Amino acid sequence: MKKVILLLIALVSIIRAGAQDEEKPVKNIFQGTRFINLQSANVDSKNELQMFIQHRFGNINGGFYEFFGLDEASMRLGFEYGITDNFTVGIGRSTYMKTYDSFLKYRILTQNSSMPLTVTATVAGSFPSIKDVIPEAFSDFSEKASGNVQLHIAKSWNKVGFQVSPGYIGTGYIPVENNSYSFFTLAAGGSVKLSKKVSVNVEYLYRFEEEIDYVNPLSASIDLDTGGHLFQIVISNSQQMFDQAIITNPTGDWSEGSLYLGFNLVRGFNFKQY
């Protein structure tokens, strides 16, 4: 609970901050539309397509025998498209549980000289298509599908960005828990630009659910903007890359050195000229 109170205090500080606002709208507070694993307040521009190739290797504490995680990789391939400058849709497919995911994302407010914050809403869902793993009692679509709603509230101070994201998730059936849950969440993240093309990020999510055995997800990354690509080098206690698994199944633990290295490779395509 102390962590939640600190996050709420940070949000109040953002709103009351006296830092000088930009004269022009601040549309991209962070380098990408995903913070690290979770969504950021950014959206794609109209007619912009982004392709995501996300890789997380196995646990680094497997040592040389597991080649520090390279033998047990998990992957997600995703696509996002900007319907308008404020509305993005996305789909993806992960190797974990052969899971398909999708989301809708709408930017409600944009930071500018008269508006201190950017506010974006996300509605996401996922569905595991793996066979012979989920019990018959949970085989219906409604039992297996998950849904996650988040509100992303972000603020930029030149080279520094901060975001809090309250949310609510219905997990669907979770094999490792042999159960399903519905609960509130609160995520927070910060980003610092070291240069025009390099930034560092940290994100954390708190679950208002005590029955799930795993720790809360905590991730860090270094972002490299090469022009046509965004390359993120990631270290996290969560190996998976869609909301349900990120939130409920972070199998690593920072305190034990049980972590997953990986990367996000994002390639953008602009169709405005066609």
Residue ranges and their predicted role:
Residues 15-19:
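Sec/Tat signal peptide C-region and signal peptidase I cleavage site
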Residues 194-201, 212, 229-232:
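Substrate-binding/catalytic groove segments of enzymes
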Residues 181, 213-214:
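Short hydrophobic/aromatic segments of transmembrane alpha-helices and their interfaces
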Residues 20-138, 144-149, 154-164, 168-172, ...:
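Transmembrane beta-barrel domains of Gram-negative outer membranes and organellar outer membranes
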